[in-house]
Regions:
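N-terminal small-domain helix-loop-helix segment of the aminotransferase-like
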Residues: 2-105, 299-302, 405
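Helix C-cap/helix->beta junction micro-motif
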Residues: 31, 140, 203-204, 329, ...
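Conserved core of the PLP fold type I
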Residues: 66-203, 215-231, 398
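PLP-dependent enzyme catalytic core of the Aspartate aminotransferase-like
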Residues: 87, 91, 95, 349, ...
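Hydrophobic residues in well-ordered beta-strands that form the structural core
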Residues: 125, 210, 367-369
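Conserved core segment of the aminotransferase class I/II
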Residues: 147, 229-313, 320, 324, ...
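Conserved glycine-rich beta-strand-loop-beta hairpin in the small C-terminal domain of fold type I
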Residues: 293, 297, 312-323, 333-346, ...
Length: 405
């Protein structure tokens, strides 16, 4: 007799963005004459640059000839792309072996699957946090039961205005998820701040899973774009990154994960974790699609970087427009300078979902309730800078004119 995985019963009844979609559909059905302006999910909106389109076409064309056709590629990724990714770190004075780079179909699956190569242990996540980290921990059986929305075995690293959205060290944690620039708060971390977690992880033989998916949005040259800019991080950290937001590949699907050969965990010699991840990938993953990998190669060229930077600048200008609009209304907000997200306080301490409904009903703008990212997100709200400029401007204008404060 077989049953279900009981850990799934501890998941929230609905995924955050599914609930947003449900409420938005209900509003649209009740008011079909109104246009809803979406500043919610962080999905890219602008067309891919010409050089990238040409590269993707090239990838398709290669499949049209017997001489250039390719079937399955290496599970770890195209060797040229792995080298190009490793070389891209040199600008930050980081030397990677291409064999430490594993090409993926985007960051999300690796962020969840990485924990499968580690034994039981305590997981720590920032609070508020990207929901996938928490749901992954629940499914793996490491989170324990939920009591009033708090998971008994999960360590919550509180990030708020008081601590500058950078958490204090936990008493104990075996696997630590960190994300900078941060989703949802838009906060960044300094090298000195990250060093405290690297030192903690080395002392305790813990592993940091560092989500760097928004690193391309960092404009401040003093801020680190990679955890490996921190001395010792190669001994304790795995970095996950993606072409989704930096190159507009949300629908194309391509990313990478760095697993250093020098990474050390309890009862495992250097190289073991890299070997285990390689074994895991060759068992469960047939490799990223050949076509996106052709695009990824061009993203990392000088021309590709210039074209992608222009789109990043476009989204950051959207963020500036949103921040300015909130400031004009006297609403406190954070982020949006080195990240595409703006994290705002709800007026008068209003509950996040109550503000979602108020914003939708009064201004026809959709955002993301902060509490959906964790208990410490209550009383906050995330707005996304991913959108067409005309929609961003219309949304900010509607908030200015119609939000009753």
């Amino acid at each position: 007799m077989v049953g279900i995985n009981a850990a799934y019963d501890n998941l929230p009844t609905s995924y955050l963005f599914s609930e947003i979609a449900r409420r938005t559909r209900a509003f649209t059905a009740a008011h079909p004459e109104l246009k809803v302006l979406r500043l919610g999910i962080g999905n890219t909106t602008e067309a891919l640059p010409p050089t990238l389109i040409e590269a993707l076409h090239h990838g398709v064309n290669l499949l049209s000839s017997r001489e250039t056709y390719t079937g399955y590629g290496d599970e770890q990724g195209n060797s040229k792309l792995r080298k190009a990714i490793a070389d891209s770190y040199l600008a930050r004075n980081i030397k990677l072996d291409p064999l430490e780079v594993f090409v993926s179909d985007g960051a999300k699956s690796d962020l969840g699957n990485l924990t499968t190569i580690f034994g039981p242990g305590i997981v720590a996540v920032q609070d508020p946090v990207y929901p996938a980290y928490v749901d992954t921990t629940i499914i793996s059986g490491r989170a324990g039961a939920s009591f009033n929305g708090i998971l008994e075995d999960l360590v919550y690293l509180v990030c708020n205005e008081k601590n500058g959205f950078f958490p204090s060290l936990p008493e104990r944690a075996d696997i630590i998820y960190l994300c900078y620039p941060n989703n949802p708060t838009g906060a960044t971390a300094t090298k000195e701040q990250l060093k405290t977690f690297v030192d903690f992880a080395i002392r305790n033989k813990s592993v940091i899973i560092f989500d760097a998916a928004y690193s391309a949005f960092i404009q401040d040259t003093n801020l680190p774009r990679s955890i490996y800019e921190i001395e010792g991080a190669d001994k304790c950290a795995i970095e996950v990154n993606s072409f989704s937001k930096s190159a507009g590949f949300t629908g194309v699907r391509l990313g990478w994960t760095v697993v250093p050969k020098t990474l050390v965990v309890d009862r495992a010699e250097p190289g073991k974790v890299n070997s285990l991840w390689n074994r895991r990938q060759t068992t469960f993953f047939n490799g990223a699609s050949n076509i996106p990998q052709e695009g990824g190669l061009v993203v990392l060229t000088e021309q590709g970087q210039r074209e992608c930077q222009a789109i990043i600048d476009y989204y950051l200008e959207n963020a500036r427009i949103i921040r300015t609009g909130l400031l004009d209304l006297g609403i406190t907000s954070f982020g949006g300078e080195n990240a595409p997200y703006i994290w705002m306080k709800t007026p008068y301490g209003m509950k996040s979902w109550d503000f979602f409904d108020k914003l939708l009903e009064e201004t026809h703008v959709v955002g993301t309730p902060g509490v959906g990212f964790g208990p410490s997100g209550e009383g906050h709200f995330r707005l996304s800078a991913f959108g067409h400029r005309e929609n961003i401007e219309a949304a900010v204008d509607s908030i200015r004119k119609n939000l009753r404060l």
